[in-house]
Amino acid sequence: MPVFLIGMVLLLAGAIVYVGLRAIRWLRTMFDFKRTYILWVVLVLLPLLFVFGDMLSASAFARAVTITGGVAIGVFLYILLFTAAADLIALLLRLTPISRKPAFRSRRTLRAVGCIVLALGVCVSAYGVINAATVDRTTYDVSLTGSSTDGLKIALISDLHLGSEIGSAQMRRAVDEINACKADVVIIAGDVFNADVEDCYDLDEAAAELRRIDSRLGVYAVLGNHDPAPDYPPLQAFFESAGIRLLDDEAVSFPGFTLVGRAESASMHGDGRGTR
């Protein structure tokens, strides 16, 4: 694990230096940019907000810090991707007659490319933020020979990732979509939490929203790799408050079918903190 972390830190540092040097070169095509330390501070500190937010106690402030850091990381990664793509295109163009034209190396061209890279990074990130708040519904029709489950409607949702960024507001939209399906049984297929249960800034409100799920046969869940261990007391208390039954290597039978919930293979015990 230490070797992996060191490798990730070095990779991130290299990416920051690469983007920073390209950004300085771009900014100097528009004005006399001398205070480069400001750019380096921004590039280093903004992504760290995501880590700092996770270290704070669950609150609206911690949520704002974490979301700001998360969005900053997203914008940075897309700018890194588009910058690398622009450099690759420029490298390939050097092999063509286009590279001999004065416009190829002009400040105007560099300025335009930098603006395009920045605009693409911001726009793609904005699309991701908007899309993340959208609940998509997909319908599958399944026929079972010799089964008495004709007309049975099952609603399955996964990856709620409750935590410092996602809480009751997102659960309200999800529950409204689930209830609109008028399902007979509801299944939550893992990753109910993003990490620790107590990271959720409005845990009680989120549980109250999930308790609104209306289904004839109940609401059932299994755990995913992001969830704490099944024996973690805060997790058990949350499921009880939300009216959700956890199936941890358990099965429940109904007329015509049996619902089986497998345990998460990478089980974590103890205090249940962190991911499994």
Q: Residue ranges of each PLM-predicted region?
A:
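Short amphipathic alpha-helical coupling elements at transmembrane boundaries
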Residues: R63-I67, V142, D176
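Alpha-helical transmembrane signal-anchor/signal-peptide segments
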Residues: A132-S147
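A broad, low-specificity signal marking well-ordered, structured residues that form hydrophobic/aromatic
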Residues: V124, Y140, F257
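Soluble catalytic domains of enzymes that build or remodel membrane lipids, polysaccharides, and related
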Residues: S143-R276
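Non-catalytic terminal accessory segments
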Residues: M1-A132
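Preference for short coil/turn "hinge" residues that link or interrupt alpha-helices
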Residues: V122-C123, G128-I130, V135, K153, ...
